[in-house]
Amino acid sequence: MAAGSRIDLTNQFLIAMPGMADDTFAGTVVYLCEHSERGALGLVINKPIDIKLKNLFEKVELSLDRAELAEQPVFFGGPVQTERGFVLHEKQGEGESPYTSTMSVPGGLEMTTSKDVLEAMSSGAGPRRVLVTLGCSGWSAGQLEDEIGRNGWLTVGADPTVIFDTPVPQRYQRAVSLLGFDPRMLSNEAGHA
């Protein structure tokens, strides 16, 4: 890569290598919502916590009558802003009201941090396919690139079916398989030719 050039990893999965030194991210798949010269922001998609969506809605004094969502787990999105909710969802349809605080991610997903998305879901509207996290993952300028350079992460284009349709215990393996090889072939040893 030429000096001064950079790769945009927005709408990519970060897949933790088996030798990941940081226990917080060991075994994780992170969906990158934003990656720029200022840093990166993502959500861990395969670490559920012991809270169901219906319980989270109760905590914010909303009801959730959508059976397909009520028992869905809330996820640990990362160690940053752990008291804040992040809702990863498919892009809103035509004619739907926009939410107060939504980031559009190239590739068709959106991340919303305002309570109005929960209110829409509570009323039976809102996004149909969601992943809700408490906290997010953040990297300062150059930090993620450094971790990738030290063989901490693999990257691959994100596939929404891994986020929304793949059972949680299979998400890591499924994300690795997007690279075209068996996850059992990963080693925690890195080499350079």
Predicted feature locations:
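A short aromatic-anchored loop/beta-hairpin motif
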Residues: 1-133, 137-193
